[in-house]
Amino acid sequence: MNRAQTMPGIAASTSSFRVAQWRMLLAAMFCYLFFYTGRQTFGFAIPGIQAEFGFTKEHLGWASAAMLWAYAIGQAINGNLADKFGGRRIMTAGAVLSCAANWLTSFASSFSALILPWGINGYFQALGWAPGSRLISNWWSTGERGKVYGLYVFAAGCASVLSLSLIHISETTRPY
């Protein structure tokens, strides 16, 4: 007979912890999916941005570079922020701030109005990976982390499918 059979409270608490683990993972995956969705849509929007505003590929390349450089700098900083303030807080702040930066980017009609919020979005996007990884490592044992990180990264891949699907739907259903 194992301890869980002789002590029913242990089995119940183990079971409820397991449910909490999966809830945390699904919440982190959902959040990370939308972090990636906020990044992926820019690439799909480039032809429309070029057509509407007359930006060159060079302009849009600089905007993408600003986002990626800010993202890289943010990766170096934000893991420490997650250690200091907690992964959940930092990841949540990043999601909200990235949403705001994406919203601001949507109003851009000049190159400077595009590159600034998109670059800032890169930093806010970097608030997703390291804090989410901290959450996962705090909740899951070392033996389970490979599977769990695989699921976490799978959410990023799903973002590409979601982004492309949403763009296709909006392109085929818009009235103009």
Language-model features: locations:
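Conserved MFS/SLC helix-loop-helix module at the cytosolic interface between two early adjacent transmembrane helices
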Residues: I73-F111
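Short hydrophobic/alpha-helical segments at membrane-entry points of transmembrane helices
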Residues: S110-W118
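Single conserved hydrophobic/aromatic residue that forms the stacking wall/gate
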Residues: H168-Y176
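Residue-level signature of mid-helix packing/kink "hotspots" within the transmembrane helices
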Residues: Q40, L68-A76, S160-V161
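Cytoplasmic helix-loop-helix junction between adjacent transmembrane helices
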Residues: P117-A155
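Extracytoplasmic
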Residues: R23-K57
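Cytosolic juxtamembrane N-terminal segment immediately preceding the first transmembrane helix
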Residues: N2-T37
